[in-house]
C-alpha cells in the first residue's frame, strides 16, 4: 500500500467535503482543488492549492477548461512502477496525484427542471470531471478515485488506520464504482439527447417519451437464494434514481431474507395499496390481489380483505397504506400464515407482536406519491418499454349507457372495484360492495370464465352478491359475462366498452335492470 501524498478534490455534491479534507490535511496530504470546492475548503481553514496555480494555466472558456492539463492527467495516469513513466514525469515537472475526489455536474437535476432548455442541458454536461474519473479509475493500482461523498467516512477511517494508505481491494472497488458512475452519467445524457425531436436547429426541440437508444443503470441490492424456481439464479437490483414511494426503498424490520417471489408479490401489493386514499388493506398471492378493502382503520380493512378469500390469503403478502397497530397484527397472526407484512409504519406494539412470528418479513416502505417513469418487460432479444398504468378516474369521467342510473352507493362501489381491477391479471373481473371485494376472477383466457370464478369465490366466502357491483378490466366481447353477473344479483357494472357488440352488452344490462357505466379506459395487465 502506497501512502497518499497529494489529492485533487473537485465536487458538485460537496457533502462531507470539509471534514474529509480536514482528515487528509492531518495526514499531511497536499490538496488541489477548483472553483467552488476550493473556496469551500479555504473558507473552512483547509490549506488548498488552486489547480490554476498548480498548473500555471488559468481556468478559461467559462470554466470549460480547468483540469484538462498534462500536469493533472499525467499526475493521475502515470504508472509509478514503470521507470519510463517516472522519468518523463520528472522531466516535465509532473507530480503524482494519488487520490481524486470528483463527482459530476448535476445533469439529472438539470433536465428534471420543467423549463430546462437544450442549452441548459448542454452546459451541464461535465467534460473534465469524467476525464479525471476515468483516468484515476484506469490507474487504480496507484490512484484512488472517490465519486460518492457517502464513501468519505469509510475512506477517511481506512486512511487513518493505515497511516495515509488505502488497500488494493479498496482502490479496485472504488475504480469499479467510478466506471459505473461515468457509464450511468453518459447513459443519462444519451437518453436525453436521443429523446429530442429532430428540429434541434430550428428552435427548441421537443422531448419525446422514448429515446432512440435506451440506457438504464441498476445497482445490485442483494443476491437471492434462487429465482422464481429453485433451479434459477437471481439477484435484486434497484434503479439509480428510483421513483418516490417505490418498493426498493423498503426497510426490513424482521424476518427471513426476501425471496424473488416475495419481492415480486410485495411490489404488486404495494402498488395496489398505495393507490387508495382511504385506509386500505391488500392481500396478494402470486402477484394477484385475492382480497382488498378500504375502511376507517387498518383492523377493519384487514378483516374485510381477508374475508374475500381466506384460502388464497394463506401464505400471502399483506400490505397497508397506514400505520399498523398491535390489534391489527394480532388479528392477522391469529387468522393466518403470511410471508410478508408491509406498511408505511408500525407501532411498537405491532412490532412486538410480529416478533413472535420470527420468519415473517416485516417491511416499512415510505408512502409517497410517485411512479416509475417506465415499465420494462424483456422479450427474446428485445425490451418492451411503456409508461406505467397510473390512470385514475372520477365519477365525472364515467358515462352511463344503461336506462337505470347507479345509486350513490353504487357510484362509490363502482369506483372501488374499478381501481382494484387495475391490479388484477387479465382477464380480470372484480365484485365488491361497501369498500370490500366480494370475489376476484383473475388471469383467465376468457372473460366469462373469470366472471364465473369471481362468483364462485364470493359463494365460497359466504358473501351475498345481491346489490354488489362488478368491474371488468376490458370490454365484454359477448353478453354472456353480463348474464352471469346478473345471475348473482349484481346491480351495477363498470367496464371500458369498445367491443363490436357493445350495444348487445348494453341491451343485456337493461334487460337485467343493471346500471352500466363505461370508462373508455382499459386496464389490461399481463
From Swiss-Prot:
Keywords: Hydrolase, Multifunctional enzyme, Purine biosynthesis, Transferase. Residues 1-147 form the MGS-like domain. CDD domains: IMPCH. It catalyses: (6R)-10-formyltetrahydrofolate + 5-amino-1-(5-phospho-beta-D-ribosyl)imidazole-4-carboxamide = 5-formamido-1-(5-phospho-D-ribosyl)imidazole-4-carboxamide + (6S)-5,6,7,8-tetrahydrofolate; IMP + H2O = 5-formamido-1-(5-phospho-D-ribosyl)imidazole-4-carboxamide. Its EC number is 2.1.2.3, 3.5.4.10. GO terms for molecular function: IMP cyclohydrolase activity; phosphoribosylaminoimidazolecarboxamide formyltransferase activity. The keyword Hydrolase applies. InterPro entries: AICAR_Tfase_dup_dom_sf (IPR024051), Cytidine_deaminase-like (IPR016193), MGS-like_dom (IPR011607), MGS-like_dom_sf (IPR036914), PurH-like (IPR002695). It holds the Pfam family MGS. GO terms for biological process: 'de novo' IMP biosynthetic process. PROSITE patterns: MGS (PS51855). Pathway: Purine metabolism; IMP biosynthesis via de novo pathway; 5-formamido-1-(5-phospho-D-ribosyl)imidazole-4-carboxamide from 5-amino-1-(5-phospho-D-ribosyl)imidazole-4-carboxamide (10-formyl THF route): step 1/1; Purine metabolism; IMP biosynthesis via de novo pathway; IMP from 5-formamido-1-(5-phospho-D-ribosyl)imidazole-4-carboxamide: step 1/1. Gene3D superfamilies: 3.40.140.20, Methylglyoxal synthase-like domain (3.40.50.1380). The keyword 4Fe-4S does not apply. GO terms for cellular component: cytosol. The IMP cyclohydrolase activity resides in the N-terminal region. Belongs to the PurH family. This is Bifunctional purine biosynthesis protein PurH.
Amino acid at each position: 500500500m502506497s501512502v497518499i501524498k497529494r489529492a485533487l478534490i473537485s465536487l458538485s455534491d460537496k457533502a462531507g467535503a470539509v471534514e474529509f479534507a480536514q482528515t487528509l490535511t492531518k495526514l499531511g496530504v497536499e490538496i488541489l482543488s477548483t472553483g467552488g470546492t476550493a473556496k469551500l475548503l479555504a473558507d473552512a481553514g483547509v490549506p488548498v492549492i488552486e489547480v490554476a496555480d498548480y498548473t500555471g494555466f488559468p481556468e478559461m472558456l467559462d470554466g470549460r477548461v480547468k483540469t484538462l492539463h498534462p500536469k493533472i492527467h499525467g499526475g493521475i495516469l502515470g504508472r509509478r512502477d514503470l521507470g519510463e513513466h517516472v522519468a518523463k514525469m520528472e522531466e516535465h515537472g509532473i507530480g503524482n496525484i494519488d487520490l481524486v475526489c470528483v463527482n459530476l455536474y448535476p445533469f439529472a437535476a438539470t433536465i428534471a427542471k420543467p423549463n430546462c432548455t437544450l442549452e441548459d442541458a448542454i452546459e451541464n454536461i461535465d467534460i473534465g470531471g469524467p476525464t479525471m474519473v476515468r483516468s484515476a479509475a484506469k490507474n487504480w493500482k496507484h490512484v484512488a478515485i472517490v465519486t460518492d461523498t457517502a464513501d468519505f467516512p469509510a475512506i477517511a477511517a481506512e486512511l487513518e488506520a493505515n497511516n495515509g494508505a488505502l488497500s488494493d481491494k479498496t482502490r479496485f472497488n472504488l475504480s469499479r464504482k467510478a466506471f459505473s458512475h461515468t457509464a450511468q452519467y453518459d447513459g443519462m445524457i444519451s437518453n436525453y439527447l436521443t429523446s429530442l425531436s429532430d428540429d434541434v436547429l430550428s428552435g427548441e426541440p421537443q422531448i419525446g417519451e422514448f429515446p432512440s437508444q435506451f440506457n438504464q443503470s441498476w445497482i445490485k441490492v442483494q443476491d437471492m437464494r434462487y429465482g422464481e424456481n429453485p433451479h434459477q439464479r437471481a439477484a435484486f437490483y434497484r434503479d439509480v434514481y428510483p421513483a418516490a414511494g417505490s418498493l426498493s426503498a423498503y426497510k426490513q424490520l424482521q424476518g427471513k431474507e426476501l425471496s424473488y417471489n416475495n419481492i415480486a408479490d410485495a411490489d404488486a401489493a404495494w402498488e395496489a395499496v398505495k393507490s387508495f386514499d382511504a385506509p386500505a388493506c391488500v392481500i396478494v398471492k402470486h402477484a394477484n390481489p385475492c382480497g382488498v378493502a378500504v375502511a376507517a382503520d387498518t383492523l377493519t380493512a384487514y378483516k374485510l380483505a381477508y374475508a374475500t378469500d381466506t384460502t388464497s390469503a394463506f401464505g400471502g403478502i399483506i400490505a397497508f397504506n397506514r400505520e399498523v397497530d398491535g390489534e391489527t397484527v394480532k388479528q392477522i397472526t391469529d387468522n393466518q400464515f403470511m410471508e410478508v407484512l408491509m406498511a408505511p409504519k408500525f407501532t411498537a406494539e405491532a412490532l412486538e407482536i410480529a416478533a413472535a412470528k420470527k420468519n415473517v418479513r416485516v417491511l416499512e416502505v415510505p408512502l409517497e406519491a410517485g411512479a416509475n417513469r417506465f415499465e420494462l418487460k424483456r422479450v427474446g432479444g428485445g425490451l418492451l418499454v411503456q409508461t406505467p398504468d397510473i390512470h385514475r378516474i372520477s365519477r365525472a369521467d364515467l358515462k352511463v349507457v344503461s336506462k337505470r342510473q347507479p345509486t350513490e352507493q353504487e357510484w362509490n362501489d363502482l369506483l372501488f372495484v374499478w381501481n382494484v381491477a387495475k391490479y388484477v391479471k387479465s382477464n380480470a373481473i372484480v365484485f365488491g360492495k361497501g369498500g370490500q371485494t366480494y370475489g376476484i376472477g383473475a388471469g383467465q383466457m376468457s372473460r366469462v370464465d373469470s366472471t364465473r370464478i369471481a362468483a364462485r369465490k364470493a359463494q365460497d366466502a359466504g358473501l351475498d352478491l345481491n346489490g354488489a357491483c362488478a368491474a371488468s378490466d376490458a370490454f365484454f366481447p359477448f353478453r354472456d359475462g353480463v348474464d352471469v353477473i346478473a345471475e348473482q344479483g349484481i346491480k351495477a357494472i363498470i367496464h371500458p366498452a369498445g367491443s363490436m357488440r357493445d350495444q348487445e352488452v348494453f341491451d343485456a344490462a337493461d334487460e337485467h335492470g343493471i346500471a352500466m357505466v363505461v370508462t373508455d379506459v382499459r386496464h389490461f395487465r399481463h
